[in-house]
Regions:
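A short, Lys/Arg-rich alpha-helix, primarily the initiator
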Residues: 1-20
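Residues within the helices of the helix-turn-helix
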Residues: 12, 23, 53, 64
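The alpha-helix within a helix-turn-helix
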Residues: 15, 26, 56
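Short alpha-helical DNA-recognition segment
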Residues: 19-38
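Residues in the helix-turn-helix
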Residues: 35, 46, 65
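DNA major-groove recognition helix of helix-turn-helix
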Residues: 40, 51, 67
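Short, basic-rich loop-to-helix N-cap that marks the start of a DNA-contacting helix
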Residues: 43-54
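Short C-terminal boundary/hinge segments that cap the last helix of small helical domains
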Residues: 60-73
Length: 73
């Protein structure tokens, strides 16, 4: 699994845990829906740390909490 695939999997899991849709995440994170949908597509562009930070804020987790998961170890 690539780091991009792991990041997408983690965001997808956190969305499911919160019963949150990508459009709601976009609003909470201050991102456009197209940015979030593009981010969630593992075949699209690589994620920047700025986008990851905003997504973490939208999900209500710190960047440290986000990466503190087995898939990143």
């Amino acid at each position: 699994m690539t780091i991009k695939e792991a990041v997408v999997a983690r965001v997808t899991a956190l969305l499911a845990e919160r019963s949150m849709r990508p459009i709601e995440l976009a609003k909470r994170a201050g991102l456009t829906p197209s940015t979030v949908y593009s981010f969630l597509d593992p075949n699209r562009r690589e994620a920047t740390i700025n986008v990851i930070q905003k997504i973490c804020e939208g999900l209500g987790v710190s960047v440290a909490e986000f990466f503190d998961d087995e898939m990143f170890k």
